Curated annotation (Swiss-Prot):
Site positions (Essential for auto-cleavage): 418
Stated name of the protein: Warthog protein 4
Keywords from the named record: Autocatalytic cleavage, Cell membrane, Developmental protein, Hydrolase, Membrane, Protease, Secreted, Signal
Transmembrane segments: none
Biased composition (Low complexity): 287-308
Gene3D superfamilies with a match to the protein in the record: Hedgehog/Intein (Hint) domain (2.170.16.10)
CDD domains, per database record: Hint
Site (Involved in auto-cleavage): 415
Cellular component, GO annotation: cell surface; extracellular matrix; extracellular region; plasma membrane
Chain intervals for the UniProt region annotation (Disordered): 272-308
Annotated site, Cleavage, chain positions: 345-346
PANTHER family, alphabetized: PROTEIN QUA-1-RELATED
């Protein structure tokens, strides 16, 4: 306690008359880059929902940055100088367009729910400075924001927020709410960056038929004290945009200053199941097909392999001398990931699967080698197939899940990019129907869509269940098992093992080779150990798979 008080006194006296780097009260902190020296670079942006006069002109821009060793420690994103005029009383826009910032760099953190990091005091020597002072800005609408997680950013890395889109229309904005500098046991500097999301609309692209946009509008209406809307309003013409006003920029700072980003992709090691694959269940009822082409790899323990040749051209990967601390939540500093994209594509730990001779198991109790229920291609029979490995398995990871309320009174949850098979509720049942034909990311499922669901007790033709409501919930534990077919029944729902792309042949070949390569490397250097439940093959490789699926589409496999 005495140290904290002393630190605050020192910070106040040290920075009271010092110019620092800040976004000001009319732009939002949306990115944080860390140079190899440990110096943080704060990025500021002005989206269409913040920092504007109702006449379409910018509020005065009082962002300013500090130069350390000829390097500016912040920048302004190149945003429009003007937008369409708008009615300040319109319930779709925030009545408050400006934040209230502290006068000095006087805070050790910006933790309240209605604050973001408006500025970072100059760090003249990042390697020796342990205490960093911040200028916190308060903005009341942030009370309705959603926590997106914490990114761990080390030298040469960057975390980027910004606009979140649905159908190419912005509906939210990810911002930096808090930053904490830390030093690991090896003396390496890293920053823990809290990311939050608040509703943010472009009035020229408000389409209430898009669920995300409608939800965002209702959030803003609630913040402004207005009633919700539940239907698509008639489209009306907007006013002609006014001429652009002049951007007010401090002397020596250029709007849209470019920042060179060097990305270091650090991936966790993983281990493969060491026990031999169990035989298929005896006395299997009709409909079971022995998996083809799967050869269990026993007795190895690969770790630390980093696939080469798939790095985005914009980045120059460097050798990581010390492991980069893993980000403990949904954000990770990977430059090729879209803004706001979680890197977890999984089921929650409380999801249920039916295991042969084991009854229903929670997902966090499932193990490699278990035979789990799945529907055959046409959904006419329920069969059992083996779990080959884990794409993701992290019992302590906190993540956001899309939770569907179904018309049978049950719920079903998975992360927003994970695929689930969707059908139209009105289509007649048919033994010729391909139930794998329409895999859809959870974030794209709409109220009124139907899922395929297995009978609770009978091994016969699938049923359909309708989505009645959709919510975002936060749960602890992420699990993504890979079966020999690329799909399985989770909470009796026919779901894919994949995310982004449902190209099973491509992904299975890729991950099988990764396992083999890692196995050889691991066996050469380390002792074999058993690790049935700690495999995490997929971290960092989903982007590679998305590229491969573009090069080799699933239709050609």
């Amino acid at each position: 306690m005495r140290f904290s008080l002393l630190a605050l006194v020192l910070l106040s006296s040290s920075y009271k008359f010092t110019y620092g780097s800040e976004c000001g009260d009319s732009t939002i902190p949306y990115s944080l880059e860390v140079l190899s020296s440990g110096q943080p670079i704060l990025g500021c942006a002005r989206p269409t929902c913040f920092g504007w006069h109702s006449n379409g002109h910018q509020l005065p821009t009082n962002a300013k940055f500090f130069r350390i060793d000829q390097q500016s420690d912040g920048f302004l994103r190149d945003d429009p100088l003007a937008i369409h005029t708008f009615d300040a009383a319109d319930p779709r826009v925030y009545a408050q367009q400006q934040a209230s910032c502290e006068q000095e760099f006087q805070s050790l953190s910006c933790n309240p729910e209605d604050q973001w990091v408006g500025g970072i005091a100059p760090v003249m020597n990042a390697s020796t400075t342990k205490i960093v002072a911040y200028k916190c800005c308060t903005y009341a609408p942030l009370r309705a924001s959603i926590d997106r997680g914490v990114a761990t950013v080390s030298g040469g890395q960057i975390v980027v927020g910004g606009e979140i889109f649905a159908d190419n229309k912005p509906y939210a904005f990810d911002y930096i709410s808090n930053v904490e500098k830390k030093i690991d046991s090896e003396g390496e500097i890293f920053y823990e960056v809290n990311i939050k999301r608040f509703s943010c609309l472009d009035l020229q692209k408000v389409d209430r038929s898009v669920p995300e946009i409608l939800n965002s509008e209702n959030t803003i209406r609630h913040v402004n004290g207005h009633r919700f809307v539940v239907h698509q309003a008639p489209t009306v013409d907007v006013e002609t945009p006014v001429e652009t006003g002049q951007l007010v920029v401090p002397q020596g700072v250029q709007n849209g200053q470019e920042v060179i980003i060097e990305e270091i992709v650090a991936q966790e090691g993983f281990v493969q199941e060491t026990n031999p694959q169990p035989p298929p269940p005896p006395g299997q009822q009709g409909g079971f097909v022995q998996p083809q082409g799967f050869q269990p790899q026993g007795g190895f323990q690969p770790q630390g392999f980093q696939p080469q040749g798939f790095q985005p051209q914009a980045f120059q990967p460097q050798v990581v001398q010390n492991p980069v601390p893993a980000a403990p939540a949904g954000y990770a500093p990977m430059g090729f990931a879209p803004s706001g994209l979680q890197l977890y594509y999984c089921f929650p730990g409380d999801a249920m699967v039916n295991v042969y001779n084991g009854g229903f198991k929670r997902m966090d109790e499932l193990a490699v080698g278990d035979w789990v229920q799945a529907l055959d291609k046409n959904g006419s029979q329920v069969t059992f197939i083996p779990v080959q490995y884990w794409l993701h398995r992290d019992p302590k990871q906190v993540a956001d899940f899309v939770e569907f309320t179904l018309d049978n009174g049950e719920t079903f949850s998975l992360t927003e990019k994970h695929l689930v098979f969707v059908t139209q509720c009105s289509v007649p049942y048919s033994e010729d129907e391909n139930i794998n034909a329409n895999p859809v990311p959870a974030e794209r499922v709409n109220i009124g869509d139907c899922f395929y669901i297995a009978h609770r007790k009978k091994s016969q033709m699938y049923q359909r269940v309708k989505v009645l409501d959709i919510n975002i919930v936060q749960k602890t534990g992420i699990y993504s098992p890979m079966t020999s077919r690329g799909h399985l029944l989770v909470d009796r729902i026919h779901a894919s093992c994949h995310s982004e792309t449902d190209n099973y042949s491509l992904q299975n070949t890729f991950f099988t080779n990764v396992l083999r390569w890692k196995s050889q490397i691991r066996n050469y250097f380390w002792t074999v150990e058993d690790s049935t439940n700690e495999d995490n093959i997929g971290y960092g490789l989903n982007g590679v798979m998305a590229v491969l699926d573009i090069v080799i589409p699933s239709k050609l496999m």
